[in-house]
Amino acid sequence: SSNAELTVEEIVKIRQALFSKNYSTAKRVQSFSSKEDFEKAKKLMIEMSENYKVLIDLFPENTEDEFDTEALPTVWEEKGAFNALMTKASEDMIKLTSVIEDAEDIRGTLKQFMWSNCKACHTRYREEH
């Protein structure tokens, strides 16, 4: 992959920064959506979708034991399932762009297509905070 020239530490920092950015972006998606500013919300949804695709390649084998990672060993033990969840999260953000404007329940729709994936990943693949 294109990350071959990065150090383990750099890879961990990059993936943590991306997850962190997605979280702050998700909060902005929620805010814009609740104000019915759907154009801004959709731009951010697409940004998040792209980030999830990038994240799939940021968990190479050699980064599993990095002291600073919050990722659990289950990421590598269940790599197929983890990658599938990242892909689902990415695809759900794209689906969200097409359903959010007509959603009866904006919060519920965001929960279904966005927050539920965050929760699924944190529950299974991230250390408790």
Language-model features: where?
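Cleavable N-terminal signal peptides
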Residues: 2-3
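Sequence context surrounding c-type heme c attachment/ligation sites in exported
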Residues: 6-129
